[in-house]
Design a protein with these regions (language model features):
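Outer membrane beta-barrel transmembrane domains
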Residues: 3, 7, 120-227
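Outer membrane beta-barrel translocator domains of Type V secretion systems
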Residues: 1-93, 203-226
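Short strand-coil-strand connectors
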Residues: 37-39, 88, 115, 138-142
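Internal, well-ordered alpha-helical scaffold/interface segments
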Residues: 79, 97, 131-135
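Hydrophobic/basic alpha-helical segments enriched in Actinobacteria
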Residues: 84-86, 91, 104, 146, ...
Length: 227
C-alpha cells in the first residue's frame, strides 16, 4: 500500500466550436492518493483540490469579442482499478476502469470588449460524474516511469448547466442553458514520473478530451511525497 500527497501547477484550455467560445485556465492543485498493487492488479483513489482562475472569450454576431476573467475552485474524487500484463523490458499493458466525480465552483464574471452586449455573469456551482475505460501502457520498474493511456469517458449524470446574467446597465437578469459536456467522448493521456528519492517523485502529464461539440486539453506538473 502506498499513500502520498502532491502539489503542482495546471494549465488547461477548452474550445466550444458551436458558439465560437474558448476557455483558458491555470492555477495550483494539491491532494492525496492511495494505491494498492498486487499480482498485476492495481487499485487506487485520489482526492484533488484545484485553485485556478480562468479567462473566457466569445465571438458575437458582429465579429466583436467579449472576454471575462473569474475564479475557479474545484474538487475531484477518483477511484480506479486495473490490471497490467507484463510485456518485457519493465513495461506492462492492460485495461483500467474508474469512476470520477468533479465539482466546480465558478466565481462571478464581468465581460469587456462587447459594449452594450457585455454580460455580468453570476457565480455558480456544477458537478459531473464520469465512468472511464482506458487501455494503459506504463513502465513499472526503475526511477523513470513514462506512461500512455487512451480510452472512452461516459458522463452518467444530468446536472443541468445554466448561467444567470444581465446586460451592462440593465438590472433585470435572465437564465439560459449553458454548454453541456458531451455525454461520451474520447480521452488520451501521457506522462512521466521520476523518483528523485525514496519519498519524493516529480511528475508531469498531459491529457486531451475529444467530443462532438467541445474539446479540452490540460497539462500539469508537480511533486509527490510518499509516506
Amino acid at each position: 500500500v502506498s499513500v502520498s500527497a502532491f502539489i503542482g501547477r495546471v494549465d488547461g484550455t477548452q474550445s466550444i466550436r458551436p458558439i465560437g467560445a474558448s476557455n483558458d485556465a491555470d492555477g495550483t492543485f494539491f491532494g492525496a492518493t492511495a494505491e494498492l498493487a498486487f499480482a498485476g492488479f492495481r487499485l487506487g483513489g485520489s482526492v484533488v483540490r484545484d485553485h485556478s482562475s480562468a479567462d473566457t472569450s466569445r465571438v458575437l454576431f458582429d465579429g466583436s469579442e467579449a472576454t471575462s476573467h473569474y475564479r475557479l475552485r474545484g474538487t475531484t474524487v477518483d477511484v480506479h482499478a486495473g490490471y497490467g500484463f507484463a510485456i518485457g523490458g519493465g513495461w506492462d499493458i492492460g485495461p483500467e476502469v474508474g469512476v470520477t466525480y468533479v465539482s466546480v465552483k465558478r466565481g462571478d464574471a464581468a465581460e469587456t470588449g462587447a459594449g452594450a452586449f457585455n454580460l455580468t455573469v453570476a457565480k455558480d456551482r456544477l458537478s459531473y460524474t464520469f465512468l472511464t475505460a482506458d487501455l494503459a501502457l506504463q513502465m513499472s520498474e526503475g526511477k523513470l516511469r513514462p506512461w500512455l493511456s487512451a480510452g472512452l469517458r461516459q458522463r452518467i449524470d444530468n446536472d443541468r448547466v445554466e448561467a444567470t446574467a444581465s446586460l451592462t446597465g440593465v438590472s433585470a437578469s435572465f437564465t439560459v442553458a449553458g454548454v453541456q459536456r458531451d455525454r461520451s467522448f474520447g480521452n488520451a493521456g501521457a506522462g512521466v514520473a521520476w523518483q528523485a528519492s525514496p519519498g519524493l517523485t516529480l511528475f508531469a502529464r498531459g491529457n486531451s478530451e475529444f467530443g462532438s461539440d467541445n474539446n479540452a486539453q490540460s497539462v500539469d506538473a508537480g511533486l509527490r511525497f510518499r509516506f
